Amino acid sequence: MGSRPPCGATSSARRACQFPAPMAAAREPELPQEAPATEPAPPPACRFFLEGRCRFGARCRQPHPGAPAPPGREAQPEAGAKKPPLRTAADVIQRIRWDPRLDPADFSVGYVDRFLGVREEPFSAFCWDQPLAALGPGVLAVPQHRVRFFRFHGRLVWDRASRTDLVFGSGSAAGRGPTILDAPNTEGAHGAEGAEWTLAGTGQEAQAAPKRGSTRPLCTGHQEPGVEEPGELEAAQERALGTAADLGTLAPRGRLAGVTEEALKPTAATRTTLLGGKEAQALGVPGGSAETTEAEWGPAAWPEDKRARLSVAAPCQPRPTHFVALMVTEPGLQAEVTKAQEYLVHVAPHCANFLVPSQNLHLTLALLRLAGAGEEAAAIGALRRALLAPGLNAPPRLSFRKLVLLGPHVLCAPPSPTLESMAQVLSQRLEAEGLSTLQSPGQLHPHLTVAKVPHGSQVHLPKLEFTLSQEVGCQPLQTLWLCRIGRTGGPFQPLAEIRLE
């Protein structure tokens, strides 16, 4: 018998057959490694298109080789992207209620009534602090999901349908958008375009003056010189002293009225710096004398029972939104005022831009704060009832003779007889009707403004030695107008004419 190989040799040979030697493997060419498939394979072409029988065309879900791509197909993923979040109506309500820079009286709410459709009411007319189930009949409340939009002075600042948010700046794909707090310093609220707003240190127009008005830093801004700000002197009283009266801090009479003109002029710049721009404008400090301030505000402008220093940090009261005025319609009086304005331009040519147009000549008798068309309609009815009630003491005719310079910025003609008592009775009647009227610390002094320089301007009006003709300088007192205050650069808007008879 032949000899058998050792057991170990047999095992080694068997392993050599099963596993090739490393040298043998090195002689073989290496196969290229395929890259891992990270992208899914493209879908197969539409076989019906290849056969010429596809009826879907561009709507087909399978690719069509050689067919042009439909326009807008690349933008489809963006169109289906998630919209940026929009702050809810509840957020806007809380912001309006608790932000000290916002006045709830400046806002109105549009909501859906199940029976009447979309309605709009002032923000302050709603009850926001109680659940709906706890409210009884006669209380205006609305679920937050029925709120459709918010308006600020008639402008849309939050809208659910168009995803507009100018309160928080949400809803914009580019991030935080503009808000009413970021707008430039303007003054009016009605009829303005774009993002010109009046808030946070600028003039405001609102409905009512609630008790929290002492915390609102609201003042008047610059106004077009050709348009008189209604009740400019009376509004200055309210802005400068109304809030200070709430805080129990009023300046003593000697601070302004008891100082001579020569003593006041050297300290005018210093006082302007201490009070700041808005307070100094309201007080008429730049170039203003004690005598002109006394003539502007009247001797009763400073209450005797509260004689403390005027708080320089006291914010200004919000501006009125509407006013009641006697419009100058007599052609003879308009012609006399035009002659006075021409004489003013002849004496001071730089004052040509500050003349009040003849169509805007008026005397302000009452200042109101209204919000929305509903309150405007109610104000028209209340004004009609107030004028028809006896005891108004309205003179049949007014005459104008002298031109009075009220400070360095206002040239006016006071009427004869005066209208202080009539304006006071009218404001009391309107307030009794439930309207929000602005009451100045002293009496109102209605006057016919001939020229007016905006606050903050360095231009001073000169004193004129001009007298209006007594024969033609008259205006019958037969009708009054309810007007809406316009924004900066625009005139006021007459809303209703009401006869006194």
UniProtKB/Swiss-Prot annotation:
GO terms for molecular function: zinc ion binding. Pfam families: AKAP7_NLS (PF10469), MJ1316 (PF04457), zf-CCCH (PF00642). Keywords: Metal-binding, Zinc, Zinc-finger. It comes from the Eukaryota. SMART domains: ZnF_C3H1. Gene3D superfamilies: Cyclic phosphodiesterase (3.90.1140.10). InterPro entries: AKAP7-like_phosphoesterase, Cyclic_Pdiesterase, Leng9, MJ1316, Znf_CCCH. Coiled coil: none annotated. The keyword rRNA processing does not apply. The keyword Isomerase does not apply. Residues 1-43, 61-86, 203-234, 281-300 are annotated as: Disordered. A zinc finger (C3H1-type) spans 40-67. Transmembrane segments: none annotated. This is Leukocyte receptor cluster member 9. It comes from Homo sapiens (Human). The gene is LENG9.
